[in-house]
């Protein structure tokens, strides 16, 4: 049997999960190569952090590589030295919220396990892909790899500096990318800090500053001034909406539906989080039922509210935010930046508050936490620039990532499918909508794995149970 090769470009969680699913479902005769410059896989933006203040945002029992593995990581983590060394991971309701690096290491361990036990030949090439033409992937070191199928598992480009801050680029008080290792080490304990953005990245930053005993005033601002909600404490049965009834085809209609469902749940003494969780589980189907115009309306009007309710934070982190707000150390504003200048080591920001008033800030550090620049994804590395420049791939109409079809195949500039070039993970969310949370990313990786095996006409075996241990 001739060897066939699938090349996965990007070895964060998405690419590593895809490789594991291929190893589980594939058979002898298949080579899977993950191109990722980091020494270990599954160490992307989310799970590559080494800061112990950064915790998984949901209980460990909900972290898995496949839907039928609920509780496996939780079991393994509780038996690990990491759990014994981190008593704060155990919340009072009995759930555990590990440091995020623990999950990344666990996923990497699964990859290593399948390298040793799967009939599929798995390999990790520590390099970066810079071009893909005529079925050949070229790497930064000059290697050329023949690929029958290529998957782009490139999810999170670096943050983009807001236009008003670009003249300050390079100023020691401007922290443009808080994801960089030791980026916050330069914040002195008494520094006054401004944080632009109030989502998950901001929550990580505040938790990190708290861990390093920062005591200066922190001003957090975003246009709507909304913080991520805390995750649900306790154990509840799933709440299920009735999808058998006629469904709305508009963003406004779904907003009304969700509000009604939340009221009904409250009448049963059930928390609103259960309603949002069911919407999330069915989010891809709902998203694809909306027209492009309605999807655009959702992103413009409702996305900020969806994000703070959908992407919730660990209770340990929520507790830090609440305590700092109560003490007056942290102040949250609904505002936008209208001017910025430097005066030596001091940075002066002018904000426009939601009511129209101006507000001046003088700080020592400005930290940008507006998240990945997904609208600039195709310009974020050499490979994507080449593919885009050649007309092989194009951005999706919503500027969320890369345009794909229902099979996750990329579409060229003429709207035609590239049968040998796929996207896995969040970069495909323009098509699928709900594709940022780990359960959905893992499910998408499993779906793409089966698409790849079917496209290569390879037999697909029933997924073998993994040895899901460290």
Predicted regions and their residues:
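Dinucleotide-binding Rossmann-like beta1-alpha1 core, especially the glycine-rich loop
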Residues: 51-67, 71, 81-105, 109-111
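Glycine-rich, highly charged phosphate/nucleotide-binding loops
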Residues: 76-77
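Flavin (primarily FAD) cofactor-binding/catalytic cores of flavoenzymes
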Residues: 1-45, 88-246, 252, 256-456, ...
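N-terminal glycine-rich dinucleotide-binding loop that anchors FAD/FMN and/or NAD(P) in oxidoreductases
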Residues: 48-73, 236-252, 316
């Amino acid at each position: 049997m001739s060897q066939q090769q699938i090349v996965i470009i990007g070895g964060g969680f998405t690419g590593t999960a895809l490789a594991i699913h291929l190893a589980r479902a594939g058979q002898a005769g298949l080579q899977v190569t993950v191109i990722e410059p980091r020494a270990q896989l599954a160490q992307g933006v989310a799970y590559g952090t080494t800061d112990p203040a950064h915790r998984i945002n949901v209980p460990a029992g909900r972290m898995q590589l496949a839907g039928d593995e609920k509780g496996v990581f939780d079991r393994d983590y509780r038996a690990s030295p990491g759990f014994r060394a981190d008593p704060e991971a155990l919340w009072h309701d009995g759930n555990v919220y590990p440091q995020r690096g623990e999950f990344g290491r666990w996923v990497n361990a699964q990859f290593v396990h399948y390298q040793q036990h799967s009939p599929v030949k798995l390999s990790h090439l520590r390099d970066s892909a810079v071009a893909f033409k005529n079925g050949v992937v070229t790497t930064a070191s000059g290697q050329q790899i023949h690929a029958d199928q290529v998957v782009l598992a490139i999810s999170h480009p670096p943050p983009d500096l807001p236009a008003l801050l670009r003249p300050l680029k390079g100023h020691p008080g401007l922290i443009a990318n808080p994801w960089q290792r030791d980026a916050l080490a330069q914040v002195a304990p008494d520094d006054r800090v401004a944080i632009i953005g109030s989502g998950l990245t901001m929550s990580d930053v505040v938790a990190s500053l708290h861990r390093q005993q920062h005591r200066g005033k922190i001003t957090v601002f975003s246009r709507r001034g909304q913080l991520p909600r805390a995750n649900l404490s306790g154990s509840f049965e799933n709440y299920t909406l009735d999808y058998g009834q006629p469904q709305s085809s508009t963003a406004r209609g779904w907003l009304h539906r969700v509000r009604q469902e939340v009221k009904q749940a409250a009448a049963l003494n059930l928390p609103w989080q259960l309603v949002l969780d069911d919407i999330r589980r069915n989010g891809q189907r709902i998203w694809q039922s909306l027209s492009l115009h309605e999807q655009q309306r959702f992103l413009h009007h409702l996305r900020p509210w969806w994000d703070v309710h959908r992407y919730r934070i660990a209770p340990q982190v929520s507790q830090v935010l609440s305590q700092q707000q109560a003490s007056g150390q942290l102040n949250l504003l609904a505002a936008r930046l209208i001017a910025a200048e430097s005066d030596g080591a001091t940075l002066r920001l002018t904000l426009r508050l939601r009511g129209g008033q101006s507000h001046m800030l003088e700080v020592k550090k400005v930290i940008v936490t507006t998240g990945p620049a997904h609208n600039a994804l195709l310009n974020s590395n050499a490979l994507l620039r080449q593919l885009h420049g050649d007309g092989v791939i194009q951005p999706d109409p919503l500027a969320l990532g890369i345009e794909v079809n229902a099979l996750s195949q990329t579409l060229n500039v003429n709207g035609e499918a590239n049968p040998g070039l796929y996207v896995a993970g969040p970069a495909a969310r323009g098509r699928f909508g709900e594709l940022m949370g780990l359960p959905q990313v893992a499910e998408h990786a499993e779906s793409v794995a089966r698409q790849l095996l079917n496209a290569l006409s390879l037999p697909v075996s029933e997924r073998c149970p993994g040895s899901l241990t460290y």
